[in-house]
Amino acid sequence: RQASILFSDGDVMGAVLDRNGLRPSRYYITDDDNLILSSEVGVLDIDPSKIVMKERLHPGKMLLVDTVAGRVIDDEELKEKYANQFPYGEWLDSNLIQLKDLKIPNKDVPKYTAEECTQLQKAFGYSYEDVKTSILTMAKNGAEGTAAMGMDAPISVLSQKRQPLFGYFKQLFAQVTNPPIDAIREEVVTSTTIYVGTDGNLLEQKEENCKMLRVNNPILTNTDLLKIKNMKVDGFKVAEIPITYYKNTSLEKAIEYLFIEVDRVIREGANILILTDREVDEYHVAIPSLLAVSGLQQHLVRTKKRTSVAMILESGEPREVHHFATLLGYGACAINPYLAHESIRHLIEANLLHKDYYAAVDDYNSAVIHGIIKIASKMGISTIQSLSLIHISEPTRPY
């Protein structure tokens, strides 16, 4: 996000600029040892003859004034001091795990027949347009389909048809103080990398804080998720939590039971939770994935366990870019849209898509992640990691 942050502890004062450098921060140093920093030049009347230095904060750079020592510390000196306090490089080399380096387990990924796939699509509310227009287009072209501007469909709260929970949220966009960025021209500062695991204490410099799983794309293939489910690495414990419930049970009780199950696995040491609705059948229905993720997010915040775990979603419900962006914004750190991927398989088998299955899935995932970056950039956000938990969508209201 665009920001110029000033800070002080009484002895030192400093400023830091965001990585994009889109928030101006200019400063003067005068011959009577004053430093004046502001977003604009000319906020104070200063005799030009007293100015000994004019400079600006550069993207991602810091400035520190030590009032005790009476000196200005530049970005390079400041970062070198703190970078050498602990062997951060060694900690990362020995603790950071790459998803691409995990072994593929000798297990089969579940597959569905054409009839089973159709039944699941009906259970998760897929429409003809979802499959033949949205999913097919993204798998074929590696990008979202182009459509005319404007939205003439009724908002979900006024629709006479059942709408997915995602439809009750609309995307926000940056205004005035937080300008959007151009994610295409400024691709150099965008990042889709996320880190999965226990968030360490920012105030404690410990090697355990580096025990994380690095994932380059939060939209996971079935193989990616299979690798995570079966990873055997010290410091990581994975637990699968079903987000389905018996059809005669109330949704409220199902959510309460979900919270109880999550509390139990956390007590047993789990720090990666995989919420899955693969158990959907004629007797079991799925908790709406956005409700499960956001409800669990708030529950973990209330119980002060949120930073202890990471949430990964394995769901058949998300298929549009807006669905994924909303899930990431409300608590999920990675998503496996298994039914969307399975729909691609059956499009190929039906000769509606002439492409290798794995290439088509990669193109679909690429289209989704580029769409998410586009949504994030409207809010001035350049990294997917920064998108997590910030609620860049808000509920629609019928007025």
Regions found by a protein language model. Give the residues of each.
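Extended, highly charged accessory segments
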Residues: 16-18, 51, 71-244, 250-257, ...
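Conserved catalytic micro-motifs used in adenylation/nucleotidyl-transfer and phosphoryl/amide-
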Residues: 1-36
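Flexible, glycine/charged-enriched surface loops at secondary-structure junctions
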Residues: 179-186, 269-275, 375-387
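Flexible loop/turn segments at secondary-structure boundaries
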Residues: 12-15, 22-25, 43-46, 64, ...
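Acidic, glycine-rich flexible loop/linker segments
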Residues: 33-36, 40-61, 66-86, 323-328, ...
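Glycine-rich phosphate/ribose-binding loops and adjacent secondary-structure elements
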Residues: 1-4, 15, 236-369, 375-378
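Feature captures the catalytic cores and cofactor-binding loops of soluble hydro-lyases/lyases
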Residues: 25-35, 40-41, 46-50, 168, ...
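Single conserved hydrophobic/aromatic residue that forms the stacking wall/gate
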Residues: 390-399
